[in-house]
Amino acid sequence: LNLAAESGEFIAVLGPNGVGKSTLLGTILGTRKLTAGSVDVNCRVGFIPQQRMFPADLPLRARDLVSLSLAHGAFRRRRPPRHRVDELLAEVGATGLRDRRVGQLSGGQQQLIRQAQALANDPELILADEPLLSLDPARQQDTVEKLDALRRERGTSIIFVTHGINPVLGVTDKVLYLAPGGHTFGAVDEVMRSDVLSELYGSKVNVLNVDGRLIVV
């Protein structure tokens, strides 16, 4: 697999369970070891992890978690300014959650806090591992729009793992499709085709366009 994320590029990573989508992000982050090849990351990275609930009795507020993320970045030698923490929470639409204990938040609310943490170091590359899980449709759209604005306004590159292309179809530049039989990488109209995916899976796959939405059958 050869993959390069250009400045401001939005790459959607698709494929069934168990093909290595999360492993790919872990390799880029450096939490998974390579058996061959190399990964070069020469920029600040923000990471939105796959949804896992915080313990219900965790005695930290949303503001505390975001503050900890800042403390490991530019403000690591001093206490992060409170206004910067509040700015990050506002950026993801979580201002009203700042003083609530994270363990008492819903899965979708916790995911917003993780988004704020990912933005703490002003990343040049964001790795997002299924960040739309637990979010209602309005929040999903809001999340995609915010990431799209980041890459357009700041040149932030986005590598976005998802099970479905449709929520990000309008902002995706390229698709990396991982399958048990291999992978393919290219523009949406080059990858999301019946013949391409059929060859990847080794069996008949149909890609249908229904009212502007792609359905893989």
Q: Which residue ranges define each predicted feature?
A:
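Helix-to-loop junction immediately C-terminal to a conserved catalytic motif
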Residues: 29
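Conserved ABC ATPase "signature" region
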Residues: 80-97
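ABC ATPase nucleotide-binding domains
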Residues: 194, 200-217
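H-loop/switch region of ABC-family ATPase nucleotide-binding domains
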Residues: 162-163
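Conserved catalytic motifs of ABC-family nucleotide-binding domains
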Residues: 122
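Catalytic Walker B motif of ABC-type/P-loop ATPase nucleotide-binding domains
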Residues: 126-130
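Conserved ABC ATPase signature
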Residues: 101-105
